[in-house]
Amino acid sequence: MSSALLSARDLVAAGTALLQRALATLDDAALAEPTALAGWTRAHVVAHVAANAEALVNLTTWARTGVETPMYASPEQRESDIEKGALLAPARLRDWFSTSAAGLDDALGLLDGESWTRLVRTAQGRTVPATEVPWMRTREVMVHAVDLDGGVGFDDLPTDFLLEVLHDAAAKRSRGADGPAVVLVSTDPTDTLDGTPRSTAWPVVGLGDAVTVRGPLPQLAAYVTGRRATGLTAETGTLPVLPHWL
C-alpha cells in the first residue's frame, strides 16, 4: 500500500476516534436530543455514520471483485436505514457504530493495488477510483464528530483534514455554482506537519461578484461545510449564506 493510502487510512482512524470520543461523552438520553442538522437527533447522526460505513464496504466489494455493488439500493433505502437506526436502543446504536467502523477498516485492508484503482460510483453519482473511499469516510466521521456536539469542534480536527475539506467542499460548490461566489482566505499558518506549504485561499465559483471571507482555518472549514462558524469577516460586512453542502 502506498504511503498516500496509509496516510488516508490514518485520517479515517483519527476521525473515527474523534467521533467515538464525542459519543462517549453523551449519555443515552442525550442521543435523543436534536442537532443543528434539520430533523436529525444525535441518534440520527450516529445511525447515518454507521450506515455510511456499511455503504462504503459495498464500494470496497465492488473494487475488490469488479461486481457493481452500489452504496445504497436507493435513496429511500438510505433514508429508511437512518430512521430505523435512530430508533435503536442506545446500546445497540453505539455497538452498530463501532462494529460498522471496524468492518470498513477490515474491508479496506483487503484491497490490493489493482483494486484501489478500480472505478466505483458514489451515492451522488460521481465515478471515482476506490482510492477516494478513505477520504469519503474521513469526511463523514470528522464533520459528524462535530455535529454530535459532544466536546469536539472544528478546532480539534487535524490541519491536513481542514485543508483537504476546504479544497473538496469549495470544488463541489463550484461544480454546482448555485450559491454565492466567495473566496475563502485563511488567516492562520497552513503548513502541514511535514512543512509543505499549502493553499491559503479557496475560491468558490457561484453567483454574483465574489465576496472575500477571512478567518481561522477551522472556522472556514465549518462555514464551507454549512456548519455554524465564528470569527469570520466578509468584505461586504455580512457573510454570504451558502446552500446545502452534501
What are these regions (language model features)?
Residues S2-A8, T61-E68, L110-L246:
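Structured surface interface patches that mediate subunit assembly and partner/cofactor docking
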Residues R9, A13-L31:
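Short, Lys/Arg-rich amphipathic segments at extreme N-termini
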Residues S2-L11, A30-N52, S80-L93, V120-R139, ...:
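Alpha-helical scaffold segments that form or flank carboxylate-/histidine-based iron centers
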Residues T25, A36-G39, L110:
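Short, conserved sequence motifs enriched in acidic/basic residues, glycine, and aromatics
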Residues M1-S7, A55-G103:
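Short, helix-capping/interhelical loops that line the mouth of catalytic, cofactor-
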Residues T16, Q20, A24, A53-V57, ...:
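Structural signal for well-ordered, non-membrane alpha-helices
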Residues T25, H48, Y223:
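Conserved catalytic core of Hanks-type protein kinase domains
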